[in-house]
Amino acid sequence: MVHSQLPVAAPLRLLCALLLLPSATMIPGGLSPRSVTDPDVQKAAEFAVQEYNSLSTNAYYYKQLRIVEAQSQVVAGAKYYLTMELMKTKCAKATGKPKVYKEIQNCELPPKAQQEKLTCHFQVWSRPWLEKMELTKMSCN
């Protein structure tokens, strides 16, 4: 009688094991959650902030306060979906050489009453073999 239950027990164990796997491993090309401290996420976030500041018509730089959420998708490279909080700084954009990310992060914030915080959604497409990143989507409010 024990032998007749064996063929049923093995597939059930396999099914249970598959259900316990993280969902991201089961969906090739699907979105996977990423740690906001992951070095690749940090690099994509730096790029997004740099691009935001170069595209923005605001007279002042915005710096990264925090990465709220990060996801990635395997495409021809990796696409990072980032939700970030940015804050307007006291550093004015002067004509000439624009500030780089690390310089912007060192900019002082205005007093609390004058602070302007944005929540931004960025999509950054990374293709490391081409040494190329591209901001494919951006929305801030």
Curated annotation (Swiss-Prot):
Tissue expression summary: Expressed at a low level by the venom gland (at protein level).
Disulphide bridges: C91-C107, C120-C140
Keywords noted in UniProt: Disulfide bond, Protease inhibitor, Secreted, Signal, Thiol protease inhibitor
Domain Cystatin: 29-129
Main location, first listed in the record: secreted
Listed SUPFAM superfamilies: Cystatin/monellin (SSF54403)
Subcellular location: Secreted
Positions occupied by motif Secondary area of contact: 73-77
The family this protein is said to belong to: Belongs to the cystatin family.
Note: Negative results: the recombinant protein does not inhibit calpain-1 (CAPN1), a C2 family cysteine protease and legumain (LGMN), a C13 family cysteine protease. Does not provoke cell death (PC3 prostrate cancer cells).
Protein name: Cystatin
Taxon lineage: Eukaryota, Metazoa, Chordata, Craniata, Vertebrata
